[in-house]
Amino acid sequence: MEDGLLEIMTKDGGDMPAPLEVSTVPAVGDVISGEYNGGMKELMEHLKAQLQALFEDVRAMRGALDEQASHIQVLSDDVCANQRAIVSMCQIMTTAPRQGGLGVVGGKGSFQSDPQEPETPSPGIGDSGLLGRDPEDEEEEEEEKEMPSPATPSSHCERPESPCAGLLGGDGPLVEPLDMPDITLLQLEGEASL
């Protein structure tokens, strides 16, 4: 049939028709694969950029953590030094009162360590001449003078000439020892033993 058409056309004196150009249409699969490949390429580049930024952030955080770790180490060393200083101070504080306590205990036994007022005889105590004499001589003289007689009471404190007559007020206690000189205390203890 085509040969017949060609013969008719040539008989009429017409030119030979040019061959028809067929346009090539890409297949659907090729289009989809191209778009997929292009999208995946862009996605991979985007992910690569994000990972690179994440790595940079991790490096920065690691540097900051290293700096903080060194700072924490310095603080730990300071804390350990302060703890050792506190322990040594506690040891000094626990041992110092014991040494000072011996002196305090030893000082309590004598009236010399306590602050005293000037040794003046109390009113009512007839021992104005005791301070200028030897305590042992005074005790011997008092014992000779105040020997009890059969007709007199045995208590020396009831006699008006006794030095302790002014110290007793009925059944009341003696004068506080801190207000009296040591010689007077020895005098009173000797008379009480008699």
From Swiss-Prot:
One matching Pfam family: DUF4677
One GO cellular component term noted in the UniProt record for this chain: cytoplasm
Keywords, in A-Z order: Coiled coil
Residue ranges that the Swiss-Prot or TrEMBL entry lists as coiled coil: 39-68
Keyword Metal-binding: no
Biased composition regions of type Acidic residues, renumbered to the chain: 135-145
Start and end residues of each stretch annotated as Disordered: 101-176
PANTHER family reported in the protein's UniProt record: COILED-COIL DOMAIN-CONTAINING PROTEIN 184 (PTHR31554:SF2)
Name listed for the protein in its UniProt record: Coiled-coil domain-containing protein 184
Organism per entry: Homo sapiens
